[in-house]
C-alpha cells in the first residue's frame, strides 16, 4: 500500500514475500547483513527476518510487538479460540471484504480515530473493533500527529484503500506454516521497547526465545515513535553505542 505496487494477490503479503523484499534490498546494495528495526507489523517482519535469514540480521530493534512463539496451533485458529470470531484478526479472514469496504468508506474518520493516545479505557463491546473505529464520529483521547501529517496517510489510503494492508492479516496461518522449520531461538543482540500504556502485553518468557535481549519501556501507548520520538531516539542511539 502507500506508494508500493499494491499487488492484488493475497499471497504476495505473506512473510516469505515480505522478508524476501528485505533480502533483495540487501543484495541490491551488496550488504552482507544489517540492523533491522520495526514497529507492530514491521516488528513482525523483523522477527521473521531473523527466523528465516538469521545470517542477514546483525541486530534487531523492535517496538510494541514482542516475539511471538509459534506454538502448536496456527495463530488464527488460536486467536479465534481465545478471542472469538469478531476479533479483528479473525474477522478480516472469515468475512473478507466486509471491513475493507467500511474502512474504505470512512478513511479520514478511521485514521483520525486510530492514531490517538491517552484514550480512556473502554469496556468490551459487541462487534468488530476496527469497524467501530471507522464508524465512530467522536474521537477519544488526543491525536498523536499534526493534521498536516495525518493528511499524508489519508491521501495514501484514499488512493489505495485498505485491502492491501488487511492482506497482511490474511496470511497469518500461512505464515505459521512457512515458519515451521525455522529455529525458534534468535541469538542476535536485540532491543525491545514497549509502551507502558499499550494494550499489547509484553511476552513474559521472551528471553527463552531471544536470550540476548535488552527490554525497555517508555511512558507511551502503542505509537511509541510518534508519542516519544526524542526519548526513543536517545534510547536507540545509546543501545547501538554499547
Where are these regions (language model features)?
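Catalytic active-site module of serine/aspartate enzymes centered on a nucleophile-bearing elbow/loop
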Residues: 213-242
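Flexible "cap/lid" subdomain of the alpha/beta-hydrolase fold that forms the substrate-access gate
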Residues: 3-37, 41-213
Amino acid at each position: 500500500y502507500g506508494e508500493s505496487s499494491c499487488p492484488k494477490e493475497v499471497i504476495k503479503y505473506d512473510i516469505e514475500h515480505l522478508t524476501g523484499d528485505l533480502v533483495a534490498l540487501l543484495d541490491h546494495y551488496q550488504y552482507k547483513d544489517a540492523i533491522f528495526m520495526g514497529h507492530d507489523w514491521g516488528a513482525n517482519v523483523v522477527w521473521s527476518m531473523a527466523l528465516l535469514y538469521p545470517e542477514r540480521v546483525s541486530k534487531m530493534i523492535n517496538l510494541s510487538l514482542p516475539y511471538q512463539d509459534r506454538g502448536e496451533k496456527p495463530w488464527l485458529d488460536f486467536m479465534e479460540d481465545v478471542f472469538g470470531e469478531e476479533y479483528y484478526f479473525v474477522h478480516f479472514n472469515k468475512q473478507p471484504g466486509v471491513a475493507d469496504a467500511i474502512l474504505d468508506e470512512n478513511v479520514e474518520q478511521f485514521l483520525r480515530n486510530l492514531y490517538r493516545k491517552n484514550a480512556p479505557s473502554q469496556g468490551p463491546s459487541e462487534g468488530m473493533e476496527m469497524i467501530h473505529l471507522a464508524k465512530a464520529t467522536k474521537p477519544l483521547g488526543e491525536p498523536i500527529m499534526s493534521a498536516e501529517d495525518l493528511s499524508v496517510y489519508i491521501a495514501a489510503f484514499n488512493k489505495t484503500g485498505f485491502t492491501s494492508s488487511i492482506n497482511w492479516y490474511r496470511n497469518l496461518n500461512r505464515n505459521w506454516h512457512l515458519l515451521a522449520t525455522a529455529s525458534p531461538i534468535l541469538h542476535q543482540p536485540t532491543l525491545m521497547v514497549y509502551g507502558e500504556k499499550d494494550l499489547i502485553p509484553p511476552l513474559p518468557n521472551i528471553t527463552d526465545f531471544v536470550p540476548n535481549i535488552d527490554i525497555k519501556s517508555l511512558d507511551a501507548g502503542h505509537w511509541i515513535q510518534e508519542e516519544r520520538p526524542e526519548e526513543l531516539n536517545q534510547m536507540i542511539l545509546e543501545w547501538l553505542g554499547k
